[in-house]
Amino acid sequence: MHCPFCRHPDSRVVDSRTTDDGTSIRRRRQCPDCSRRFTTVETCSLMVVKRSGVTEPFSRTKVINGVRKACQGRPVTEDALAQLGQRVEEAVRATGSAELTTHDVGLAILGPLQELDLVAYLRFASVYRAFDSLEDFEAAIAELRETTGHPGEEDDTGAGSQENDRGPTGAGQVPEPAGAAD
């Protein structure tokens, strides 16, 4: 490893530690020429093959940014997004493969996102699975109801029998235009 200060072609490892998340090793190094110390971080490279065939390094930041779009307007914190990003990275690294497809990464996102927020899950799944009809959404919602055990709409208040602002059937009501009742 070249010294970043004097460009000497060698350095000595003084200390090595695994990072808190266990995905990389932090090494303190010392240059034998100028005696200055510097830190390096060593990680195992994980490559993602995109649909176009282009290969690029896996990026937790890209995962978080993609999920952030699906969570827009939802009560999801930045901390929760960071944890989701870490879970996704751990899942794709656990496969043991050095190369993954974008499809594999998308599948790794869906599980943790479903646990985080069902609406964000549907938004992400609609893009990831390329929903192009209402039936695709209905099938995804039916699948969610089966897997999560929600027979009807999700209700945070716990009062499942109460009417909501959508009326007694739960269907959205279309407001009448002004002057239509005249």
From Swiss-Prot:
Binds 1 zinc ion. A zinc finger (unnamed) spans 3-34. Residues 144-182 are annotated as: Disordered. Changing residue 3 to A: 7-fold reduction in the amount of zinc bound. No binding to nrdABS and nrdRJ promoters. It holds the Pfam family ATP-cone. Belongs to the NrdR family. This is Transcriptional repressor NrdR. It comes from Streptomyces coelicolor (strain ATCC BAA-471 / A3(2) / M145).
